[in-house]
Amino acid sequence: MGNASSIVQTINVTGDGNVFKPSAETSSTAVPSLSLSPGMLNPGGVPWIAIGDETSVTSPGALRRMTSKDIPETAIINTDNSSGAVPSESALVPYNDEPLVVVTEHAIANFTKAEMALEFNREFLDKLRVLSVSPKYSDLLTYVDCYVGVSARQALNNFQKQVPVITPTRQTMYVDSIQAALKALEKWEIDLRVAQTLLPTNVPIGEVSCPMQSVVKLLDDQLPDDSLIRRYPKEAAVALAKRNGGIQWMDVSEGTVMNEAVNAVAASALAPSASAPPLEEKSKLTEQAMDLVTAAEPEIIASLVPVPAPVFAIPPKPADYNVRTLKIDEATWLRMIPKTMNTPFQIQVTDNTGTSWHMNLRGGTRVVNLDQIAPMRFVLDLGGKSYKETSWDPNGKKVGFIVFQSKIPFELWTAASQIGQATVVNYVQLYAEDSSFTAQSIIATTSLAYNYEPEQLNKTDPEMNYYLLAAFIDSAAISTSNMTQPDVWDALLTMSPLSAGEVTVKGAVVSEVIPADLVGSYTPESLNASLPNDAARCMIDRASKIAEAIKIDDDAGPDEYSPNSVPIQGQLAISQLETGYGVRIFNPKGILSKIASRAMQAFIGDPSTIITQAAPVLSDKNNWIALAQGVKTSLRTKSLSAGVKTAVSKLSSSESIQSWTQGFLDKVSTHFPAPKPDCPQSGDSGDGSARRLKRDSYAGVVKRGYTR
């Protein structure tokens, strides 16, 4: 395999003295978390310059934007650019007259961090002759004295010295050079990660070890033949050592082993202490919990005053229904011909091509009342259903969506003459095969879709009703005795809102919502039948974020109090003292604590409990408001501590992983043994380095034919 020369040492990858001793304090890290979002990088403003020395900058038109042509005359006086305004690498950059932009300190710090990330792979980049000169963002910056602002009016009161500026061309070329290097590193980075995960190279706590020669042999035996590590083993060794302080190579010339890792700061934050989880983990989890609570907007979801529907609404999410199983009195957006109407009747409708279709209506037929629906996409899937009868096989039959309009309510229809107009808006042909059960024919997955938009129906008559039906249709008349199904709603109907900002409450479109009034106002049946954009679903979605935040932060068990459950306890303590009706029950604090804890645990398991009337505690809006506000306070007042149970559990779990890892590495050393130092091979002259080369017949990746 040979020697590799790096800046600090000469190494022998397959030789003696190398160390493989991963520990929690030297865990691998190479991920540069860059903050390059536009909101962080911009706006830094632009530089402005006075038009003339005699002109007051407060005069109209006294400032103009600086361009690259202004740099020489302004930068000569700046000590940072004493050699001239043009940076040392500017010969490589076109020097055109371009407007300048101000670079924020945040941008400089993050681009510098990106440069550092590339240097993890410097030896490999040099081998490829890619980015032979380490990029330096500061070389492309010029520091000038100027007025700074997005507008001239803002800039005239903001004169600054030594402001970093850059032209768009230089900025683009710099980013392109970084991107080109990252492109060249794509497979290299993957292969390095494969090598680091083929066997455990990190441990969550403590320390593990294995002879490095055994590790190298395992990698040689298992790495893919096209792995770049086989082609560039020396460069890979250096790159791995920079990432992981547990991988150390002996300096052959000095006879010393040094930790080459550059991640000591990050690794220490990732390591647990003897009694607490890693600092980074605690910080991240607290941040996640706070982000969830912020997204839930506790003030909005606990409001006792009306909130505009667009403010309360969430991004629309699809909801699934089986229309045949919904109660008509709960799903107020449905209509049904009474089952007592015993005489089926045939109707004939057309589609947008003028083709005529026949269908039947009968008692029990259901439709969607489009007048109570916001713009919506309907997708009906009959997959897995049978619909077979003695004289009716669904295979090859067609099902369609039909839109009706009539001034007569649907539930009063008894004849085709009562229908104003109707059209087939879409249809599909079914494929079905005989089931394993007798007399059943299973329909394959279907996708009968329709996008409902009110504007398409030209709703000008306020007395006109609009309905959507899913049913079998045929080009010939369908015998009412052969096909007895009232419709084909016994399927999976997915409804997806096409517009955001519209909210319904139990089927009625509303302009505003009082969130606190939603608490405990739905039965499980009415919640199940609610539309996708129902206020209850919006409330549950927001409440789910609160529940997830509690789960991240809280490790209290059943009946145990916690900072997140005691807000409910406080509310219960006061409410039992309030004057009311019936027998008053006074619970001691121990009982109240358990009641509050159970209510919180039920909420974590199913956030919809705040909406349904079945939840005895959180269906009270006062208890819900206390919880929502209390969780926010609990997280805001938390430091970087962790729950007692969480700390103990994670530490004991980490110790079990440490034991497993060491056991695995012991097996590696057993099955891929390192040469014994006291067994020189014939011809050994006694020189350490010569003995190392001769006795290692396996020689790591050298056996694959690579040059030492």
From Swiss-Prot:
Coiled coil residues, start to end: none
Region (Disordered): 671-708
Key words of the record: Apoptosis, Capsid protein, Glycoprotein, Host cell membrane, Host endoplasmic reticulum, Host membrane, Host mitochondrion, Lipoprotein, Membrane, Myristate, Outer capsid protein, Viral penetration into host cytoplasm, Viral penetration via permeabilization of host membrane, Virion, Virus entry into host cell
Superkingdom as given in the UniProt entry: Viruses
Keyword Glycoprotein included in the entry's annotation: yes
Transmembrane segments: none
PTM characteristics: Cleaved during the endosomal proteolytic disassembly of the outer capsid. Mu-1 is proteolytically cleaved into mu-1N and mu-1C during the maturation step to generate the ISVP. Cleavage of mu-1 to mu-1C is dependent on myristoylation and binding to sigma-3 protein. Mu-1C is further cleaved into delta (59 kDa), and phi (13 kDa) segments during entry into the host cell cytoplasm. Mu-1 and mu-1N are N-terminally myristoylated. This acylation is essential for the membrane fusion activity.
SUPFAM superfamilies xref list: Membrane penetration protein mu1
Molecular function terms, GO-annotated: host cell surface binding
Residues carrying lipid (N-myristoyl glycine): 2
GO cellular component terms given for this protein: host cell endoplasmic reticulum; host cell mitochondrion; host cell plasma membrane; membrane; viral outer capsid
Subunit structure: Heterohexamer of three sigma-3 and three Mu-1 proteins.
Domain notes: The C-terminal region, phi, determines both targeting to intracellular membranes and induction of apoptosis.
Family: Belongs to the orthoreovirus mu-1 protein family.
Name of protein: Outer capsid protein mu-1
Originating species: Reovirus type 2 (strain D5/Jones) (T2J)
